[in-house]
C-alpha cells in the first residue's frame, strides 16, 4: 500500500467511507467519539487544503439499536425484521448526523446530509439531480455526509452496503480517489479473523478473477453489512472509471494523511 499522503497529495475530489465496526467500541457497540472526532478533524484538514471531500458513513442502524437498547431476537418474521431495521435507522441516523454536525462545527466546517437509495442512481433524473446537488455542495465548501436511506429502502430499492454506495458516489461525482476505512487493514488471501495464516497483500495493480474470489471468503462484521467481498466489488466499480483510484485503510490505526 502506498503512503496515503502521497495518494491524497495530487487528488482534488476524495470520497472517504467508514463502516459501522470502525465507528463503535467493539465491547459495547456504543459510538467511539474519539475515533469520530479524529476522522472529522482529518477530513476538515484535508478540506482546508483546498480539496473536496465526501464522507460515506455507516452506523445508523447500529446507533439506533444502541439508543433503544435493542438486541436481536429469534423468531421474527421478515416484515418484523424490516420494520425494526427501518425504525432503528430513523432513530440512529438522526443521532449519527447530530454527532457529525457538532464535530464538524468545532472546526468551522459545514456538513450536509444526503440519503440515497438505488432509485437515486438507476433513475436518470434522480441521478442527474443527485450529481447537481453534490456539485453545488462541494462548490459551497460543504462536506456531504452520505448514507443509504435505510428508513425507506426495501430489498427492491436498497443498495445493500456502503462499500458499494461509496464506489457509486465516487463514480457519480467523478472523484479522484476512494478511501475505504475498515476494521481490517487491507486485502488478505483469506479472512484473517478466521484464518491466522492468511497473508496480507500490500498492493493490487489489477482486479483479476483470482483477487475477486479471495474477497468472497470474507463476511462482514457483527454490526455492519460489508465484508472483504463488498470492498472488492467497490474497488471494481470505482476503478472502472479511469479518474478514480482506490485504497483501503485500517480505521483503527491509520491516519488519513500520515
Where are the language model's segments positioned?
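Nucleotide/pyrophosphate-binding catalytic subdomain
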Residues: 1-239, 248
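Acidic, glycine-rich loop-and-beta core segments that form the ion-binding/anion-interacting portion
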Residues: 242
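Conserved small/polar residues in nucleotide/adenosyl-binding loops
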Residues: 247-254
Amino acid at each position: 500500500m502506498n503512503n496515503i499522503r502521497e495518494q491524497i497529495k495530487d487528488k482534488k475530489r476524495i470520497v472517504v467511507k467508514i463502516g459501522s465496526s470502525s465507528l463503535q467500541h467493539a465491547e459495547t457497540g456504543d459510538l467511539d467519539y474519539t475515533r469520530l472526532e479524529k476522522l472529522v478533524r482529518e477530513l476538515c484538514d484535508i478540506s482546508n487544503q483546498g480539496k473536496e471531500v465526501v464522507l460515506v458513513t455507516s452506523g445508523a442502524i447500529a446507533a439506533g439499536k444502541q439508543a433503544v437498547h435493542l438486541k436481536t431476537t429469534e423468531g421474527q418474521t421478515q416484515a418484523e425484521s424490516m420494520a425494526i431495521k427501518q425504525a432503528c435507522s430513523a432513530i440512529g441516523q438522526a443521532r449519527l448526523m447530530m454527532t457529525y454536525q457538532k464535530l464538524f462545527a468545532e472546526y468551522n466546517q459545514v456538513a450536509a446530509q444526503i440519503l440515497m437509495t438505488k432509485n437515486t442512481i438507476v433513475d436518470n433524473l434522480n441521478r442527474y439531480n443527485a450529481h447537481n446537488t453534490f456539485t453545488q455542495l462541494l462548490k459551497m465548501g460543504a462536506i456531504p455526509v452520505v448514507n443509504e436511506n435505510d428508513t425507506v429502502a426495501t430489498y427492491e430499492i436498497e443498495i445493500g452496503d456502503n462499500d458499494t454506495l461509496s464506489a457509486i458516489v465516487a463514480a457519480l461525482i467523478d472523484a479522484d480517489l476512494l478511501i475505504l476505512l475498515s476494521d481490517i487493514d487491507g486485502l488478505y488471501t483469506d479472512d484473517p479473523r478466521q484464518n491466522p495464516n492468511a497473508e496480507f497483500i500490500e498492493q493490487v495493480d489489477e482486479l483479476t478473477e483470482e483477487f475477486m474470489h479471495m474477497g468472497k471468503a470474507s463476511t462482514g462484521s457483527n454490526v455492519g453489512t460489508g465484508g472483504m467481498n463488498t470492498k472488492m466489488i467497490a474497488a471494481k466499480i470505482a476503478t472502472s472509471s479511469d479518474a478514480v483510484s482506490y485504497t483501503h485503510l485500517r480505521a483503527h490505526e491509520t491516519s488519513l494523511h500520515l
